[in-house]
A protein has these predicted regions:
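Conserved N-terminal structural module of periplasmic/extracytoplasmic solute-binding proteins
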Residues: 4, 31-33, 39-45, 49-52, ...
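Helix-loop-helix "hinge/cap" segment bordering the ligand-binding cleft or interdomain interface
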Residues: 182-186, 210-212, 217-295, 318-364, ...
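Conserved small-residue motifs centered on glycine
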Residues: 450-571, 577
Length: 614
């Protein structure tokens, strides 16, 4: 039988057929030789309506407050001196120093971002020489603090300033470490200005509570669901994407004669059948607190649950009344725990989940013991598939990513396993920058069509081609001579992430496992789009809020204690060492630790964020 409930209708078949199958089947065996990059053209900028940009920025200023270019402390003299030297490099070669964590933004085996083909083209097109500075791998946080503490900083620093600088971005501006950009955007960043004209709500993410625009953001964007044509940078919408979620063995489903589970009852019945009919040792298996894993299970109960060591962003959600709530104290959390306790008690959930790591979970999957788990796509499934077939060419292994669990079929969850469109990191212009114009023009180039294609796709004719209006990889990427995975081969041509709009379609295509058979590629795409387009329709977690210095100390002290307690009690409730009859007492204890004050602080931060949008 064929399993039902497989959602593979993300978009018209044109999107899959033209782009994926076209690349898989008919990529050129001899890619076109890379032509000399065109000289930097101003057409993207001049095509914009200058008056509308001016009106937009004026309206933003009225909304966010007066521009703070003469902030208190050392920033006054620093910003002023910088502003007067914005054109100092006009008469000679233009050079910009750029600090960025290579390990988290490249993905290629290079010593400098400047070695990437996209950046070679950017330097040629813009006429700007970029001197990259990279912290040692794994030491970005420490070296960020050291660089910022010094008197001389690079012109551009790409990092999460709002959360990593004491006091946030406003404090960094007041201290003269970075400059506010609102007075420069119209002239020096017309591409980004135009993008925010089209998507004004996103401006709040890079605007401080005091009204300062403090950097060029890294955001996820996507061609509209169902679109028959790929969309350029200005038409793509901000997008809450996810490349992680629930996976189930469809070959096992066929063996037990059942469809892909949708509701909690469906999941229970399927896992029970896996155990009783197939003798699976671990019908469901996952790593404790695996990033976003719990939301795929908890969302149907109306709660957002904490993961990743109970960081401040997780566990909190925004309800239908636009109020902040904490999932682990809601009634739905009790239902979530009861469901997992039921699976645990009946041997349907691996009883060792508290101590499992990703390697041990994969080992059990490879042995055929697991029917459902949490996976990252597509590298996770692709690697598993290749390892299984290597040992057993006749293995029927087939798995697909599925929707979050729901209470009732046909209903839509409020919370989803998705990342917010804004990643939290920005390219900020530092107070040491002597040529603001050049630094901003460099970053703004990535917000125009030409620069954005380079950063996302690489070199046209070499790493990608346009086929029926869709970018698709050439054979140099898909079937490269070195035998590398497409994502690895592509890493030399594009920047993995950074202060520009990232194209979800590129991320989707680059993550496709082309070693799979044609039908399995179809499943691969279906899984990714189930998670990103179905699960990620809404992001109702906390946006890019910031806490005041006066709030941070009180909040951290209380929430750290709460996080530890919630984690301990969650494990006890799931394993049954603590009866769920004591759930109300547990909630009272959480509030006695200062939960209400934490909620009040987060609500005030959300209110300030919302005020930026209005």
């Amino acid at each position: 039988m064929k399993c039902k409930n497989l959602r593979m209708d993300f978009a018209p078949k044109t999107q899959y057929d033209r782009a994926i199958k076209g690349a898989w089947k008919s990529a050129e065996s001899n890619p076109k030789k890379h032509e000399e990059p065109k000289k930097y053209e101003e057409k993207e900028k001049t095509n914009m309506k200058k008056n509308s940009r001016r009106d937009f920025l004026k309206a933003s200023a009225a909304t966010f407050g007066a521009a703070l270019l003469t902030a208190c402390g050392s920033s006054g003299s620093s910003t002023a001196s910088t502003a007067t030297s914005t054109s100092s490099a006009e008469s000679g070669p233009r050079t910009v120093s750029y600090w960025i964590d290579l390990a988290n933004t490249s993905g290629a085996d290079v010593k400098s971002m400047g070695d990437l083909y996209c950046w070679k083209a950017i330097e040629a097109n813009t006429g700007i020489n970029v001197e990259f500075q990279h912290p040692a791998s794994g030491q970005a946080a420490e070296q960020f603090n050291l660089v910022v503490a010094g008197n001389e900083m690079p012109d551009i620093m790409y990092y999460s300033w709002a959360t990593n600088y004491s006091g946030g971005a406003d404090a960094a501006i007041e201290d003269g470490k970075i400059i506010p950009l609102q007075d420069y955007m119209e002239e020096y960043a017309p591409n980004m200005t135009h993008y925010f004209e089209l998507h004004p709500d996103m401006l709040a993410d890079i605007t401080t509570d005091s009204g300062n625009i403090y950097g060029f953001p890294a955001i996820y964007t996507s061609t509209a669901e169902g679109s028959k044509e790929w969309q350029g940078v200005f038409d793509r919408e901000p997008f809450a994407e996810s490349f992680i979620g629930l996976v189930i063995r469809t070959d096992y489903l066929e063996q037990v004669g059942m469809d892909v589970p949708v509701t909690y009852d469906d999941w229970y019945n399927v896992l029970k059948a896996f155990k009783e009919k197939l003798g699976l040792k671990y019908p469901m298996c996952f790593v404790q607190m695996f990033e976003q894993m719990s939301v795929a299970i908890s969302a149907g109960f109306g709660v957002c649950v904490p993961v990743s060591g109970f960081s401040a962003a997780y566990g909190y959600g925004i309800n239908e009344e636009n109020k902040v709530e904490f999932g682990p104290v809601k009634d739905g959390y009790k239902d979530y725990l009861a469901f997992l306790n039921k699976l645990y008690s009946e041997g349907l959930l691996d009883n060792d989940y508290m101590v499992l790591d990703r390697t041990s979970v994969q080992a059990k999957i490879l042995q055929g013991y697991v029917g459902a788990w949490i996976e990252m796509m597509p590298t996770g499934l692709g690697n598993l598939k290749s390892q299984i077939l290597k040992d057993d060419p006749n293995n029927t292994f087939s798995a697909v990513g599925v929707h979050e669990m729901v209470k009732t079929a046909g209903t839509e969850n409020w919370y989803h396993q998705a990342n917010q469109p804004f990643t939290g990191s920005v390219g900020a212009i530092t107070g040491s920058c002597k040529d603001v114009k050049t630094a901003m023009e460099l970053l703004d180039y990535g917000w125009g069509e030409e620069g954005n294609m380079l950063l996302n796709w690489g070199i046209e004719g070499e790493s990608y081609e346009m086929v029926d209006g869709w970018p698709q990889f050439t054979d140099a990427i898909i079937h490269n001579k070195e035998g590398k995975a497409p994502s690895t081969a592509h890493s030399m041509y594009r920047q993995l992430n950074g202060p520009f709009p990232e194209d979800h379609w590129q991320r989707l295509v680059s993550k496709t496992d082309y070693s799979l058979a044609e039908g399995e590629i179809d499943q691969n795409i279906a899984s990714l789009n189930t998670w990103s387009y179905e699960n990620g329709k809404h992001y109702n977690g906390l946006p890019a809020t910031t806490l005041l210095d006066s709030e941070q100390a009180a909040y951290s002290g209380a929430f750290n204690e709460i996080g530890t307690y919630v984690g301990e009690m969650t494990a006890k409730f799931i394993t049954g060492t603590e009866s769920l009859d004591n759930f109300d007492d547990y909630v009272k204890n959480v509030y006695s630790m200062g939960m209400q004050n934490c909620l009040d602080i987060q609500q005030e931060a959300l209110d300030r964020y919302n005020a930026r949008v209005k």
